[in-house]
Amino acid sequence: MGIRGMLRAAVILLLIRTWLAEGNYPSPIPKFHFEFSSAVPEVVLNLFNCKNCANEAVVQKILDRVLSRYDVRLRPNFGGAPVPVRISIYVTSIEQISEMNMDYTITMFFHQTWKDSRLAYYETTLNLTLDYRMHEKLWVPDCYFLNSKDAFVHDVTVENRVFQLHPDGTVRYGIRLTTTAACSLDLHKFPMDKQACNLVVESYGYTVEDIILFWDDNGNAIHMTEELHIPQFTFLGRTITSKEVYFYTGSYIRLILKFQVQREVNSYLVQVYWPTVLTTITSWISFWMNYDSSAARVTIGLTSMLILTTIDSHLRDKLPNISCIKAIDIYILVCLFFVFLSLLEYVYINYLFYSRGPRRQPRRHRRPRRVIARYRYQQVVVGNVQDGLINVEDGVSSLPITPAQAPLASPESLGSLTSTSEQAQLATSESLSPLTSLSGQAPLATGESLSDLPSTSEQARHSYGVRFNGFQADDSIIPTEIRNRVEAHGHGVTHDHEDSNESLSSDERHGHGPSGKPMLHHGEKGVQEAGWDLDDNNDKSDCLAIKEQFKCDTNSTWGLNDDELMAHGQEKDSSSESEDSCPPSPGCSFTEGFSFDLFNPDYVPKVDKWSRFLFPLAFGLFNIVYWVYHMY
């Protein structure tokens, strides 16, 4: 076979190839079908048929052919059945779930697949991959994300879009995008909460009469990268659903992708819970301190409350201003309550210790000291009177039997006694109540009564011999000695204020006793003694009367109740002793009893001891209930 035969074979092959390329168009030229024997390799058959030929000329020819009569404004099968559009998503990352903004950010590959018969080709069996520039030349579904706040298609280094054409006209369109979608977070159990965030896909303009959206591959349309990590959250799973929604423009198919995540509580344990627990426990150190350490205990309580308030404020800055009460808010409030109770406990024992405790004890000890002072006052006064009576008795017993031997009192001595009685203020019956009987039985000596004693003036002088020995010859010395004794004994009675060794009160320093009665000075007593009857029987009866009066007055002094004794210190203790002046009514007695039971000073060490056990126990029970409820 020569050169002519080879040329003829080549022409025949070209004709056959041309007829195959123009198979869709009617041609008057008959088509020939060549059957090769089975011994011909498949590679040779593909070479002749050119089904895997996708070179530049073939692709250009295919695109020119399909796009020459393609209208991008019309959906596939326009006027006929709706176009099925399959959706699939490949998630590469979920960057952030924000509690403040109530949203999350997701980056993904979003794929849509549909069939457009206008793009079918037969020149090759290979799929054609086209770049982003075909986006303006081909029809694509108008899917959008219903809950998206912001979204963008990545354009580094070029716009991340891809088209893939199949010979039967199937189109697969994929884009790489990042969107920020709204997510309504339920923060009631924060930070032990589980959240579900949705990604909703829907057609914007085409109703179910034009487009039907559905998930690809029978529920396996969602794929996640193996390195998916969500900050502060753990990915639990995903679910996909679809439903039909109705609007006034028609019905639409809505696809829903739901992510389940759980918050990691470890960071909050370190940043919030442990500092809060340690601060609360630190506030209980005051229970082991002495209850009179006011500065230390109050400082610990206030510092603990300040730390808890700072932690709460720092936490609120990271959370939205919502009305719901979060679990962590309850925990911090309970810790604040325990710290406040520790402060309240110290206020309670501080009130018991200082108002009903040591401060109360000196006022209570004043009562027996006042009684003792009153007793001493009576003892001094009556003792001095008894001494005077004894001196008078001794003087009478030492008198001579013959009264004519006693010299008469001179007018000068009587004048001295009279001037002394005028200078010494006489005790009245109202001010000297314990000696009323004595003042009634022994009238005061006057100048006239003394002048009626012709024979006893010398005896009266001898009755004062004990008090001023060596001055019997000079009668003018007697008033001076009496005056000195008055001045010496004018300050003999003491009154106890805070201690029994302290100075007299203002009343006693002005000559009054504990009850406000005038004290009987020795000058007055001496004047009275001068006028007493020197008869033996009268002296004895007067002595017995004074002793009887002393016993009665002493008994009445010890029989005084607390209110009468406290009345003597009214000017100094009016504010503190007003509690004891409650009238004896049933309501007052109940109130006093309840107040004593509630504010008993003996509870001071017991309250701290109970608090050391009760506070940790209550706080531990609260933590058990709190964590079991929120974790399980």
From Swiss-Prot:
Biased amino acid composition, Low complexity: 426-439
Query: Quick one: signal sequence residues?
Result: 1-21
Q: Membrane spanning segments where? A: 269-289, 298-315, 327-347, 612-632
Quick one: where's region Disordered?
410-458, 491-523
* Residue spans of biased composition, Basic and acidic residues class: 491-511
Biased composition range(s): Polar residues? 413-425, 448-458
Q: Which reaction does it catalyse?
A: chloride(in) = chloride(out)
> So which tissues is this one expressed in?
Expressed in brain.
The residues exposed to the Extracellular compartment are 22-268, 316-326
- Membrane topology reported for the UniProt record: Multi-pass membrane protein
Query: Where is the major localization of this protein?
Result: membrane
Write out the topological domains of type Cytoplasmic. 290-297, 348-611
Among the GO biological process terms of this entry, one is: chloride transmembrane transport
One GO molecular-function annotation for this sequence? GABA-A receptor activity
Q: Which GO terms describe its cellular component?
A: chloride channel complex; GABA-A receptor complex; plasma membrane; postsynaptic membrane; receptor complex
**Activity regulation (UniProt):** Potentiated by etomidate, propofol, pregnanolone and pentobarbital.
Where in or outside the cell is it found? Postsynaptic cell membrane; Cell membrane
In terms of InterPro entries, this protein maps to: GABAA/Glycine_rcpt (IPR006028), GABAAt_rcpt (IPR008101), Neur_chan_lig-bd (IPR006202), Neur_chan_lig-bd_sf (IPR036734), Neur_channel (IPR006201), Neuro-gated_channel_TM_sf (IPR036719), Neuro_actylchol_rec (IPR038050), Neurotrans-gated_channel_TM (IPR006029)
Q: How does this polypeptide assemble, per the annotation?
A: Heteropentamer, formed by a combination of alpha (GABRA1-6), beta (GABRB1-3), gamma (GABRG1-3), delta (GABRD), epsilon (GABRE), rho (GABRR1-3), pi (GABRP) and theta (GABRQ) chains, each subunit exhibiting distinct physiological and pharmacological properties.
Question: What is the role of the protein in this entry?
Answer: Theta subunit of the heteropentameric ligand-gated chloride channel gated by gamma-aminobutyric acid (GABA), a major inhibitory neurotransmitter in the brain. GABA-gated chloride channels, also named GABA(A) receptors (GABAAR), consist of five subunits arranged around a central pore and contain GABA active binding site(s) located at the alpha and beta subunit interfaces. When activated by GABA, GABAARs selectively allow the flow of chloride anions across the cell membrane down their electrochemical gradient.
The record's comment about this protein's domains reads:
GABAARs subunits share a common topological structure: a peptide sequence made up of a long extracellular N-terminal, four transmembrane domains, intracellular or cytoplasmic domain located between the third and the fourth transmembrane domains.
| Family that this chain belongs to | Belongs to the ligand-gated ion channel (TC 1.A.9) family. Gamma-aminobutyric acid receptor (TC 1.A.9.5) subfamily. GABRQ sub-subfamily.
Protein known as: Gamma-aminobutyric acid receptor subunit theta
Give the organism, scientific name: Homo sapiens
- Its gene is GABRQ
